[in-house]
Amino acid sequence: MIGTRALSSVTVEQKEDGNGVNVTTQNISYCTSGMYRNALITAGIKNADVKVAGPFKISGTAALVGVMKAYEEMTGKKIPEKSKDAATDELITTGEVAENIGSDDAEKLIADVKQKVAEDNLSSPSEIKQAIEESAKDLNINLSDTDREKIQSLMDKISGLDLNVSQLTSQAKDLYDKLGGSQGIFDKIAAFFQSIFSWLSNLFS
């Protein structure tokens, strides 16, 4: 859950187009830089360098609210409440899923499913469920039923935000470049045998 006491300090610096969202942390024990970044992009934040620091080791969950408020004050633009709500839910869900599959895999999985939902305008429970299964398979991640339900609930919210896919991927370019280049192991095997089959077909044709 999001902390009720904000012990962290946050700074947000507006950067030029193409910079993306970059987050650095200090004395934050629960939320990773990637978790913050993914959630902030969902909120609509773009081209900003963000620093989150604690006076000692703290979870850092309450800092997300502070970053969004600082961004609003810096740009003079109000972030819609439903975007804030989805971003907060994303941070919580990613953290909870990370407890079972690790932070790196949780960040990649949530980002990949989010891209599918936004890119294909997925909204029905069955479509979102299929997207979750496909992403988990591609990334070779085993999910518990509980984590599937949490991600499903999050994506239900995200599907109503009308996210801009190009903005989504450009603000975390390094992450989405990795995801774009990652195929599931079975896909790689299938592609390998397909290439062998094509070579043999050409050889004997």
Which role fits each region the language model picked out?
Residues 8-14, 70-82, 99-112, 146-154, ...:
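Short, Lys/Arg-enriched charge-dense amphipathic segments
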Residues 39, 116, 154-157:
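Residues that form generic nucleotide/phosphate-binding pockets
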Residues 125, 129, 138-205:
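Extracytoplasmic/luminal low-complexity segments enriched in Pro/Gly and acidic/polar residues
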Residues 41-141:
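Soluble oligomerization/assembly scaffold segments of membrane-associated complexes
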Residues 1-47:
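Signal peptide-directed extracytoplasmic domains
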Residues 19-22, 27, 38, 47, ...:
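Detector for Asparagine
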Residues 8-10, 33-42, 81, 122-127, ...:
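N-terminal secretory signal sequences
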